[in-house]
């Protein structure tokens, strides 16, 4: 034991130093940077809520846009900023940039996560990559089990039809009818089913 005593003490001291280093990094570097990023985002988020996509993304000359905040603050930027930047790019028709931002969205909110995946699908539709779009819509529907899933299943069905996968599309439409009949999509789903059930 005496031979290993110094080794054990050294390992314990190193572990304490590493733990303190992580704590110090979080407390005195990361958290202040995250707060600053949040403050910088405020004007851009107001523009986002007003659907001023260009201003929200790139700023107005006086305030930073979401893209610049992400570039300046990196991982300290709130997760929602990646989602918002992706939506801005999607609305502006910049589909590849939208996909890049949306792939980097790491938020924990299931509804926003599903929506970000669905928006990636919309971007793939814009790029006419219907196979990837279909994968996104199906994945989005699998993230949540509520009426929002019906919208993603409808998109999956329409996209499957675009790919000539009518039986797969019918499966998505029937899922809406059976599991989400009270959703907006559920009210009109019979016309999609009857069109393919012939």
Specify the residue positions occupied by each region the protein language model found:
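Short solvent-exposed coil/turn linkers within tandem alpha-helical repeat scaffolds
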Residues: 69-79, 92, 106-114, 140-149, ...
